[in-house]
Structure formats: C-alpha cells, structure tokens
Amino acid sequence: KNINNEVVRSFWSEDNEKFEDGNGFEQIEPFIKNKTLVGYNNYYYDDKMLVLMMRGLKPTDLHKFNDRLIGGDKCSDIKIPAWFKSLDCMQQIGVAHPSLKQIEGNMGMSIVESEVSFTIDRPLTEEEKQETCEYCSYDIQATIEIFKLRKHSYFDTKESLLKLYDNSKAARWNTTTISANILLDYPLPKWNRLQIPEDKWKHVDELPTPAYEMWKYAESDPTYKGTYSEEIFDCDIKFAFGGLPGENVNEHWFEDVKLLDVASMYPSIIINLNVLGRATNVYQSLKEERLKIKHVDKQKSDALKIVLNSVYGNLKNQYSLLFNPLASATVCIYGQMALFDLCRRLYHADYTLININTDGVAFKDNDPNSPLRNFMDYEIIWKQWEQDWNMTLELDEFDTWIQKDVNNYIAIKDGKVKVKGAETNKYNFN
C-alpha cells in the first residue's frame, strides 16, 4: 500500500515459481528498489523474511526461518542488502514495546485476527487466500496510521540526525546510537571515581550525612540504587540516583507560586564536568547552535536536542560508546547538589518550598515586606546560584498550585491549567 492506504501491488507465490501475471516473489526486488518500505517490527522480522523471499526460498524453508525469528533468534546470517531501505515504526516507540495489535486497540481500531491457521501444510484455498490478504491489509492500514503519527515527531528528526552524522550504515540505528556516534567514534574512557569539584561541597553543608554516604558508596559500586529520605526545609526530600523529589509536608494548596527551572540541566553539567573529554567542545558547540536556531529551524533544533539529551542516558548504556557509569553517577549527584543548594538558599531567605523535581523548585514568598528581601530576594539568590553552579535558571509563575504529592499537581496560570501525574492528567480543564 501507499501512504494513502491504496493497494499498489500484491505478491503471492505457492511454490515461489514464476506466475504468468508476474506477481511471484521473484518480482519483489525490482518493485521495491528505490522505494522506502515502512513496517512495524520489520527490522527484526519482515525485512529479513522479504530478503529470503527474494532469494527464492521455498515456503517450507521460509516457515523454518519464520519460526526461528518468532522464537527470538535474530537470524544474523540473513544480510540486508545495502540498497534495501526501510523504516520501522516500532523503533523507540516506548519502553513497553507494544505489539501492533496493542496499538490498534489503543487507537480505537478493531482487533482483527486471521481465521486461517498458521500451521496449514497444504496450499490455501481461494477463500483462505482472500482472508489472509484482508488480514494483512488491515495491519498495513494500522501501520500507515502509526507512521503518520510518528513522522514528524520521530522520523523527520531521525533524518536530520542522519544528515549530521552522514554515514549510510546508520540508517537502521536508533536516534540514541546515532547521537553517540555524532559525538564520538571511539569508546569514552571510563572514570574510576566520582569527580565532584571540591569547591561545590561547601554549598551543601546542610546535606544529611546518610545522603552523602549513600552517594560516596556509588564510587565502589556504580550500579548501586540506594535511596534516603528525610524531612528537611519543611519538605519530605528523597535522595537517590535520579532526581531530587520533594514536597511540602504542611500544605497542599498555594497561591502566587514561582518556579525556577534549570535550563538544559544535564547537558550543562556534562559540559561543566568535561564528561566527554575531547568531545565536550563539540557537545558545547551543538548546544550553542541549538539555542541559535531554536526558533528558526525547528527540525534541526529537535535533532540537536536528541543528541544533547541522549548523552546522560548513554552514560548508563553498556552498549554505547559513551558508557561511563561513574560519570553518570557524578552528573546525577552534581545535579542533586545544585538543586539542594537552591532549596537551602530559598528556605533560609524565608521562602516556602512547595515542590522539588529533577531540575526545578517551586516556592512562594511568605513575607514580601520582610527586611530579608533587601539582600536575600529570590532574584538575588537566583543570580548568585547561577554564578556558583555555572547553570541557568528560568522563571515561571502560577496563580494557584494544588498538589497531592511531588508527582501529582495542578498549576493554574492566567486561567490555563497545567497538570502532572496519573492522579490529575486524566482531567482536561482547558
């Protein structure tokens, strides 16, 4: 089918012999050359089966490879020709790797299953052929709809990444792998210790000792996933190896709330700590280029955003060139230290902390007329913090903020509602 869901060609072969109408499997190759095929999970199944069909394998042999692929065998002996172009709509669709049938259900489509058994050992009847074609046609229709939904958000951006990398071998890679290879063509040297600059510890002198000890333990075991929670600054704060979640323990409803977010926090930390070594300068130039073109060339900007944001995840990916567990732990700890310091400064300036997340702090002013405001106003704290941590904060403001906990809240600004969390986002107020 084409993008308009119109059937442009059908291929059928009982014994892979050449039919008079020229629609046997031997006709697939000349038809698909110079075209880009789109499928769902085709990088792991359909593409390989098509290659075998074009080789002229008998149905009995095709069935054996089918069973191997479905059984989890990658069949790496099946080589995809260099001219063969395809896109896989399943690529990076989500950590759950939903099946096509699951997506059809989520899209409100009917779940159509074939009544024709996959174990028939005889030629299909005309009626069975018709039903099989209808079954395949329906799944292709669903694949077309998925492709349309992901074209701009994923495939256009991936195409921009491929232009940046300029390597034909990368066409089937996911965006995370492409991003790593844009920055490096060799494995990143691994750190043998945490590398928090000594001058940063003075800003977190109120850090709970168990949290510090937990972080230091990661030096001997980078896979350590411990957590520690404590009530501090009138918030229940959880220290771990992710964000720094925390919420006010006294109230749930707040007025006139300000939110300071760290702009591009992980990319900024990666640059500050020179995590990528020689490639850090390249990384920084990509960050600066994205800021310049953010409102001019959105597609390229989105591609650069993927490169920038994928690095932190790749530091934890053992299959990536960027794999560096202690660097990952350092970036995480550095970010939590910076957020903890911002919380500390605001709290001691008599601001009420409301919500603390991975890269931001929501707070309110208890007493705008306090003498403290002459030298501890949040704007002064803001600029001092930026100077001390070499990162940038961005301000947002809300009229009302109502929260159940750190991950479930409703924030209202100028009559518009922002919601977060499973307890709130099922409601649509706008």
Q: What is the predicted role of each segment?
A:
Residues 1-8:
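Entry/capping segment at the start of metal-dependent catalytic domains
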Residues 10-44, 49-430:
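Conserved acidic
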